[in-house]
Amino acid sequence: MGKTTTALNISSALAILGKSTLLIDTDPQAHSTISCVKNPSQHNNSLYELLISQDNRVDDYIITSTIPGLKVIISRISMAKLEPTLLGQIDGHYRLKDALSPIRKKYDFIIIDTPPTLGIITLNALVASDAILIPIQSSYLSLEGSDDLLETIDKIKKVANPNLRVLGILITLHDRRTNLGKDVVSKIKNVFGRKVFRTIISKSVKLEESPAYRESIFTYAPHSVGAIQYKQVAKEIIIRAKN
């Protein structure tokens, strides 16, 4: 349970809390898309077409999700072809930022779900963003890649997006019953300090099941611990975004 589960459920929580929210799925696996959009294959316009065509009519690519108040720009497998295409373009890192320019002030929050690798699609997301939320699973191995990500963020700030900041570190898949889980949380807090969100996402059967049923936690188990915790995280995000 990591970035896609977090992006989907935080977007859903923000919408449920009354914030106008847009979720952008940039991952070729399209897990966010299939979890909150009915019959996504019936929609012709995806993020791939938007970025390839450099169409400035971004509203034509925004569709309604199964979560009230949550809008989506969908992804599909064709996004995998975008990586080599953008690598050969002078403006390759800026396509997403340019595409979102007309609607940035239209939404309270625009959440971007990224691929699992630090390729040019993820770099597009970092260039287009004001802030980044980093989910870290409650295990020692999950800390290993954090240094590379933070180094990439620093490079992006210096070269392309000086306003980019780390909004927070979200601990997920936490087992409160084990000493190991407690030790990892302590380690993460020692490394990242006040950047760590107060709310910790517990390991949960419902949270692990919801992607298999192609749903967010709010449509699959709206009264579960996972839903309550993600809503608490969303409230923290609203506060931090104001600062």
Regions found by a protein language model. Name each.
Residues 1-243:
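P-loop NTP-binding core
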